[in-house]
Amino acid sequence: MVKKIGVLTSGGDAPGMNAAVRGVVRTALTEGLEVFGIHDGYLGLVEDRIEKLERHSVSDMINRGGTFLGSARFPEFKEVAVREKAIENLKKHDIDALIVIGGDGSYMGAKKLTEMGYPCIGLPGTIDNDIAGTDYTIGYLTALNTVIDAIDRLRDTSSSHQRISIVEVMGRHCGDLTLMSAIAGGCEYVITPETGLNKEALIQNIQDGIAKGKKHAIIAITELMTDVNQLAKEIEAETGRETRATVLGHIQRGGQPGAFDRILASRMGNYGVKLLIDGHGGRCVGIQNEQLVHHDIIDAIENMRRPEKLELYKVAEELF
């Protein structure tokens, strides 16, 4: 029977992580459990940065961006000896189970602990929206609004100067944030890992638009696909139209979470605790068709795939 649980945030931060921690803490205390916050992710777990949390510990946190527990990337957690040290620290505090809030790397750590017999629950916290088994991740929709706001501002100046603007959006190997922001921001072109980058076709499309009287354009592209500053130079050389690249970077991770992310994070935090109380371990939480669900975390990482957004790409193509 679970009496004490730990909670940590890991990997890249996302708006709504604090709301998720709050959901975990308040639910656990209401259910008569003790809660321990682990600072700086798996690194803090190994280094025993663990403190008991009370209701007041998460007061005034639901509206704050970032994560008050701190986060860190800790690749050394892949090593068995390092994970054994982590479990040793959990046992030292009599912590029976762990809730991990983060992205795919964080899930991998929870998976490894699960395989070593330690019950973990994963909550999807990442702006990339790249986690299998959920329609939305905590922080994604807030980041989407941040990107759209930037695109709106770029459109103002691009139209004033008859300029082509390239906007680099986060997402790594997932184009969801780029695709949705391109549709909502009215971008003329969208390039994601799912579509690939065809420079010749892109430049030809831009030239065709100019020939039809297009005065300016915005291109949304997912990070890591190419050097956007070099791409801007190539487009300007081929089209004769001034072209500039804007890398939004880590601004996409910051800021107050929107209402949707606050509610989603609160629901997921509450649900994660209930799963542990019901005897479930080694699970990851998701939301599908507006319903909270849970999956085997090992199966989710190894076998589940995110559905392709073919309909949305078709919409984007027809609107652009």
From Swiss-Prot:
One of its GO terms (cellular component) is 6-phosphofructokinase complex. Allosterically activated by ADP and other diphosphonucleosides, and allosterically inhibited by phosphoenolpyruvate. One of its GO terms (biological process) is fructose 6-phosphate metabolic process. The keyword Metal-binding applies. It is found in: Cytoplasm. SUPFAM superfamilies: Phosphofructokinase. Signal peptide: none annotated. Its main location: cytoplasm. Mg(2+) binds at D104. It comes from the Bacteria. InterPro entries: ATP_PFK, ATP_PFK_prok-type, PFKA_ATP_prok, Phosphofructokinase_CS, Phosphofructokinase_dom, PKF_sf. ADP binds at R22, G23, V24, V25, R26, R155, G186, C187, E188, K212, K214, K215, H216. Gene3D superfamilies: 3.40.50.450, Phosphofructokinase domain. Keywords: Allosteric enzyme, ATP-binding, Cytoplasm, Glycolysis, Kinase, Magnesium, Metal-binding, Nucleotide-binding, Transferase. The active site is at D128. One of its GO terms (molecular function) is ATP binding. Substrate binds at T126, I127, D128, R163, M170, G171, R172, E223, R244, H250, I251, Q252, R253. Homotetramer. This is ATP-dependent 6-phosphofructokinase. The lineage of its organism: Bacteria, Pseudomonadati, Pseudomonadota, Gammaproteobacteria, Vibrionales.
